[in-house]
UniProtKB/Swiss-Prot annotation:
Phosphoprotein keyword on record: no
EC code(s) of this entry: 2.4.2.7
Gene Ontology MF term list: adenine phosphoribosyltransferase activity
Protein family membership: Belongs to the purine/pyrimidine phosphoribosyltransferase family.
Organism: Pseudomonas aeruginosa (strain ATCC 15692 / DSM 22644 / CIP 104116 / JCM 14847 / LMG 12228 / 1C / PRS 101 / PAO1)
GO CC, one annotated term: cytosol
GO biological process, one term: adenine salvage
Functional description taken from the UniProt entry: Catalyzes a salvage reaction resulting in the formation of AMP, that is energically less costly than de novo synthesis.
Alphabetized UniProt keyword annotations: Cytoplasm, Glycosyltransferase, Purine salvage, Transferase
Quaternary context: Homodimer.
Full protein name: Adenine phosphoribosyltransferase
Length: 182
């Protein structure tokens, strides 16, 4: 399926003042209610990564799970889940980070990756880059490396992609929104 940025953007709802005043939340749930838009999104990522040399896909809690698991299935790659604190049942590594909303912790099972593994990390969007930087730190602490950070949406004005690139992590997104774009 051919990528159509207009179709993609038309399936992303802008929700002003959520979860707090001044924030425009990018709601991707309409994207998952449109089989055509979802197929186009997954197919676009699959086409980009089908011949890429990485061993695992990482997915960020919670909306990153949606796209990361679909791409992992399509590419036949193991899926590593990065969860919010207290959600994983076995031994974990944890990493603190700042989000656009405040402070939080990210965890991953301690046996999820091995030295030499290479991880493509998915999230729904790149805002400040805090969660993806925390995931990258966890990947490295487990002896693996980050192949790339991928997202459906980039919010470049918040600087996350730049922060990731400054940390040596390449990024890819299907579309970008200005903060005031509706």
């Amino acid at each position: 399926m051919i990528f159509d940025e207009f179709t993609l953007k038309s399936q992303i709802r802008a929700v002003p003042d959520f979860p707090k005043p001044g924030v425009v939340f990018r709601d991707i749930t309409p994207l998952f209610q449109s089989p055509r838009a979802l197929r186009m999104t997954v197919d676009s990522f699959v086409q980009r990564y089908i011949e890429a040399d990485f061993s695992h896909i990482g997915a960020m809690d919670a909306r990153g799970f949606l796209i990361g698991s679909a791409v992992a299935y399509a590419l036949n790659k193991p899926l590593v889940l990065f969860r919010k604190q207290g959600k994983l049942p076995a031994d974990v590594l944890a990493e603190g980070y700042q989000t656009e909303y405040g402070e939080a912790f990210l965890e991953v099972h301690a046996d999820s990756l091995c030295e030499g593994d290479s991880v493509l990390i998915f999230d729904d969007l790149i805002a400040t880059g805090g969660t993806l930087l925390a995931a990258a730190s966890l990947v490295r602490r487990l002896g693996a490396r980050v192949f790339e950070a991928a997202a459906i949406i980039d919010l470049p004005e918040l600087g996350g992609s730049t922060r990731l690139q400054d940390a040596g992590i390449s990024t890819f997104s299907l579309t970008a929104f200005a903060l005031d774009e509706r």
